[in-house]
């Protein structure tokens, strides 16, 4: 007979052990320990208690005096609470209500019954509301519950309901200075306008006169630059705390200075003007459907993957370039409908502020430009080359954000349009485009540190070469493509490869390339499923999105492609299609206050 061993596993063993203990418990057989709590006697099996509870396992297996006792006194918990916990250890079910959960949680924590503690926490989180929030939070704090994720869910509820909670006396009594400071410091507290947060802080201070001494500290965690001047004058300066707090007066003065210095706002990187937002939104500034201008609404790809619309500047403008400066969006040039009913190159510049969902008209460029490129370096926005209906030029000018003024700088080496520009490591890279002779592979980089004097420069200043430097050419000549910087490299997508001047026909370029500035080398990556031009690009969740454009099957697109740089793969249908098919769109990632998005949602 063979000596091979085969193992058979019972499918009912675990259940039979549990049911066996339950049967012994119900029949009061082999019970070997009595637990005495508040004059109540609970009989049980040591073996079962030790398998269910770390507390009892140590008690009955370690060198403790209770190990050999058959009667054990337990203090610090209630008989009612322990009765539920003991039943849970035998039967695996736990009956919870708001009347009993405190005693049950106390007992479960006492005997270190982790699963019962988790059930109590889940119950409390499911039942939490405005009326019992303070009670629930105090309860969990009193027992120092350390269940993973509980504090995060509590904080999420509080941040979501901060303003209505601060109208409740019980919550005002509960909320400590330390917790208030932490919540006011959070970017997740984005559902409410800042003035409502200020009014909530006033309620907390007024709840207890002894809290007034904390006013200076608390107001430093409010962001007064996110309010409006009317908020400041009507609700802040009229309060008793404005007279009481020197720090509050200082914060107000700084906010009023911020409001007054309109041009400098995009460069003011302070906590007071930073939007309360955790995740950026993908914003699409709309362009054209074919040769027809569309309205100037902004499309927002909001989570969970829903398109919303925001109003844009009320002009018949198709911007060609978009520059982002510290979460302000500048739309520049492009084409606009003239009084003659024809489209003309535009010199107009608009600034969008998502803090207040507001637009400003800024100083026009020195010359109208379409099909040009821009880049932001320091306090300047550079506009490079481009064309009008009648002329292609090489002139380069820069916009001084503080002075709201344009000036010419060293021009691009050749006349060009249809190129693309992106800033990387403080330098402006220009790729591709159309010169007088052909579609280009050329790559030039502009280094402002080597720039000549801008004094007396005009659109026709002779070419200098000290600040423009040629880099390795792309593998493919292209124009009307898109380029974006990501993880220290430049990625180029699509465009037009060849323009046949005799017939004005074009050939699409589905290729993707990446440039490494450290090696000055271009590498070909996976091609797009179908070539396109006039599309938009943005980075979202470590992936690069390609939106809309003119595909080379002859159709305009409303689709979104996503490219994973790490896997070098394209995906389709990761995101919903745009509400309409667009060409010439400008795309970016912007942070919006949640209350602005909530208003958009209600209006959509």
UniProtKB/Swiss-Prot annotation:
InterPro entries: BACK, BTB-kelch_protein, BTB/POZ_dom, BTB_POZ_KLHL15, Kelch-typ_b-propeller, Kelch_1, KLHL15_BACK, SKP1/BTB/POZ_sf. It holds the Pfam family BACK. GO terms for cellular component: Cul3-RING ubiquitin ligase complex; nucleus. The keyword Repeat applies. Keywords: Kelch repeat, Nucleus, Repeat, Ubl conjugation pathway. It is found in: Nucleus. GO terms for biological process: negative regulation of double-strand break repair via homologous recombination; nuclear protein quality control by the ubiquitin-proteasome system; protein ubiquitination. Kelch repeats lie at residues 328-379, 381-426, 428-473, 489-542, 544-592. SMART domains: BACK, BTB, Kelch. Gene3D superfamilies: 1.25.40.420, Kelch-type beta propeller, Potassium Channel Kv1.1, Chain A. Residues 133-237 form the BACK domain. The keyword Ribonucleoprotein does not apply. Substrate-specific adapter for an E3 ubiquitin-protein ligase complex. This is Kelch-like protein 15. It comes from Danio rerio (Zebrafish).
């Amino acid at each position: 007979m063979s000596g091979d061993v085969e193992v058979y596993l019972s499918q009912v063993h675990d259940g039979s052990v549990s049911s066996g203990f339950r049967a012994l418990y119900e029949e009061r057989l082999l019970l070997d320990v009595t637990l005495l709590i508040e004059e109540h006697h609970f009989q049980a099996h040591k073996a079962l208690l030790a398998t269910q509870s770390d507390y009892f396992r140590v008690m009955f297996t370690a060198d403790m005096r209770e190990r050999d006792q058959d009667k054990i006194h337990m203090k610090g918990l209630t008989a009612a609470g322990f009765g539920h916990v003991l039943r849970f250890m035998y039967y695996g079910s736990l009956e919870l209500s708001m009347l009993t959960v405190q005693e049950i949680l106390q007992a479960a924590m006492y005997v270190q019954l982790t699963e019962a503690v988790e059930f109590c926490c889940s119950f409390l989180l499911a039942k939490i509301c405005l009326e019992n929030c303070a009670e629930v939070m105090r309860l969990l704090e009193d027992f120092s519950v350390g269940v993973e994720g509980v504090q995060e869910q509590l904080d999420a509820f509080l941040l979501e309901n901060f303003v209505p909670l601060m109208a409740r006396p019980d919550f005002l009594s509960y909320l400590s200075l330390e917790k208030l400071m932490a919540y006011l410091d959070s970017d997740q507290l984005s559902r409410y306008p800042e003035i409502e947060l200020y009014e909530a802080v006033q309620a907390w201070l007024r709840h207890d006169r002894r809290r007034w001494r904390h006013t200076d500290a608390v107001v430093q965690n409010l962001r007064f630059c996110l309010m409006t001047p009317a908020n400041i004058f009507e609700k802040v300066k009229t309060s008793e705390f404005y007279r009481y707090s020197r720090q509050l007066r200082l914060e107000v003065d700084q906010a009023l200075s911020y409001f007054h210095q309109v041009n400098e706002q995009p460069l003011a990187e302070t906590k007071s003007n930073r939007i309360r937002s955790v995740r950026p939104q993908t914003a699409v500034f709309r362009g054209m459907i074919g040769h027809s201008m569309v309205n100037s609404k902004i499309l927002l790809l909001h989570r969970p993957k829903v398109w919303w619309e925001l109003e844009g500047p009320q002009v018949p403008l198709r911007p060609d370039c978009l520059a982002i400066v510290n979460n302000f969006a500048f739309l520049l040039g492009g084409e606009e409908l003239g009084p003659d009913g024809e489209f003309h190159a535009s010199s107009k510049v608009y600034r969008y502020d998502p803090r207040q969902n507001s637009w400003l008209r800024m100083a026009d460029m020195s010359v109208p430009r379409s099909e040009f490129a821009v880049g932001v370096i320091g306090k300047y926005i550079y506009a490079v080359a481009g064309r009008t209906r009648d002329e292609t030029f090489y002139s380069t000018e820069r916009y001084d954000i503080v002075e709201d003024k344009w000036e010419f700088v060293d021009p691009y080496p050749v006349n060009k349009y249809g190129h693309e520009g992106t800033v990387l490591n403080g330098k402006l890279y220009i790729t591709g485009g159309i010169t007088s002779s052909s579609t280009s592979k050329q790559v030039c980089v502009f280094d402002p540190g080597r720039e000549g004097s801008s004094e007396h420069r005009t659109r026709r200043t002779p070419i200098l070469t000290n600040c423009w430097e040629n880099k390795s050419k792309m593998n493919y000549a292209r124009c009307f493509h898109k380029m974006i910087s990501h993880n220290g490299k430049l990625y180029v997508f699509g465009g037009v490869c060849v323009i046949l001047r005799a017939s004005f026909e074009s050939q699409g370029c589905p290729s993707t390339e990446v440039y490494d500035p450290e090696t000055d080398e271009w590498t070909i990556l996976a091609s797009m499923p179908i070539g396109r031009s006039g599309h938009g690009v943005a980075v979202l969740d470590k992936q690069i999105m390609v939106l809309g454009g003119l595909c080379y099957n002859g159709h305009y697109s409303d689709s979104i492609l996503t490219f994973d740089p790490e896997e070098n793969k394209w995906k389709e249908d990761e995101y919903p299609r745009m509400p309409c098919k667009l060409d010439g769109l400008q795309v970016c990632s912007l942070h919006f206050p949640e209350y602005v998005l909530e208003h958009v949602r209600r209006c959509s």
